[in-house]
């Protein structure tokens, strides 16, 4: 009888320990801002997928709307020049297009798979977001977007 009680106790303890340590799930933080200035409207939206204190993926969608095609062309050229050096980095993609009077820039980075050393080769300023082991902390990204004037909300 003592052996049965002991085995039951071991089983219950094992269940409690393993059952209560469920794997952390991915969550989302969305940072956004709208700017209206001099006949130009900007909608900025950054969707950050994270697990624990580390970022897994970031998708940014930046929209610039104006009736001035010269301004749109200038923004498009500037965005393409900025992101073109990243085009050969796996797990990093960008797309820039003009739809009517709106420029839409979409950038996606999967930080769980990206070669952060290649990111540093493109621009050493990227070192600000990476830890020594190539991870990106959520607090670093949140601080960066907050400095841009965005409001960030996290999943509960």
Regions found by a protein language model. Give the residues of each.
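Bacterial N-terminal signal peptides that target proteins for export
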Residues: 1-8
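Intrinsic disorder/low-complexity segments enriched in polar/small residues
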Residues: 6, 22-24
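Core hydrophobic alpha-helical membrane-spanning segments
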Residues: 9-13
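C-terminal motif of bacterial Sec signal peptides marking the signal peptidase cleavage site
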Residues: 16-19
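Subset-of-secretome marker
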Residues: 24-156
């Amino acid at each position: 009888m003592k052996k049965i009680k002991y085995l039951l106790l071991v089983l219950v303890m094992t269940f409690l320990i393993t059952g209560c340590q469920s794997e952390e799930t991915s969550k989302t933080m969305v940072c956004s801002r709208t700017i209206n200035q001099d006949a130009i409207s900007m909608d900025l939206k950054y969707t950050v997928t994270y697990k624990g204190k580390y970022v897994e993926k970031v998708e940014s969608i930046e929209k610039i709307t104006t009736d001035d095609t010269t301004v749109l062309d200038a923004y498009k050229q500037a965005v393409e020049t900025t992101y073109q050096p990243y085009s050969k980095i796996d797990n990093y993609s960008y797309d820039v297009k003009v739809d009517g009077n709106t420029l839409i820039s979409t950038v996606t980075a999967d930080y769980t798979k990206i070669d952060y050393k290649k990111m540093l080769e493109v621009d050493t300023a990227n070192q600000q977001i990476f830890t020594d082991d190539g991870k990106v902390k959520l607090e670093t990204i949140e601080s960066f977007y907050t400095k841009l004037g965005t409001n960030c909300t996290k999943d509960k």
